[in-house]
Amino acid sequence: MALRELEFTSHNGTDTIQAWVYEPAVTPVAVVQLIHGLGEHSRRYLHMTAALVDAGFVVVADDHAGHGRTAMQSGTWGDAGDESATVIVQDEVTLYRKAKELFPDLPYVVFGHSLGSMIARALVLQPGVEVDGLALGGIAVGMRGVESTLDREALKAAVAADGSAPAADALVGQLFDGFLDRFAAARARGFEAVEYLFPYAFPAC
């Protein structure tokens, strides 16, 4: 396996996106653009990347603005800037274009997990983006129960604020209500692995 490191300026104009190209030792059969989820980074998928490369695929992946090595370099965590959804999608468009320049004749597949599945769906709808396959995992569609649990007035106030202060823990808890229930239940039953992993469970989104 050969590894290339790429950098490019984020759509937000401030971050330098860190990206990687993993190439097989054999003639490649296709490119897979891997898009990670909320609060994680692309190297969380190294086991999947290794399996794909062993099967002859090129894998391209980056760490979103506010995530992973990109955030380590900028010092800004969890914040892609104004219009963050647009920023992250356009950064994936940039990575797509760079990959197509490197491998113009190979079939192209996009894979996204959780938030990455939402980004992947937006990516393939962008002008000039043509793919041969779309694979989605941990598909995020809506937030279960948010209609009844969310304090909408508190959310409006948080959105209207200048953004210098983080959202209240209670509000964040309402937004992600139910996401960790299965971990909490297993922890209560004394599962040691879950006890160890529980502090890191949230990045699995």
Where are these regions (language model features)?
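N-terminal cap/lid segment of alpha/beta-hydrolase-fold proteins
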Residues: 1-26
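Active-site glycine-rich loops that stabilize anionic/oxyanionic intermediates
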Residues: 37-40
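Conserved alpha/beta-hydrolase
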Residues: 42, 49-75
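Alpha/beta-hydrolase active-site loop
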Residues: 81-100
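Alpha/beta-hydrolase fold nucleophile elbow
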Residues: 103-114
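Short glycine-enriched nucleophile-adjacent loop
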Residues: 117-128
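Flexible "cap/lid" loop of the alpha/beta hydrolase fold
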Residues: 125, 133-163
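Alpha/beta-hydrolase
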Residues: 157-205
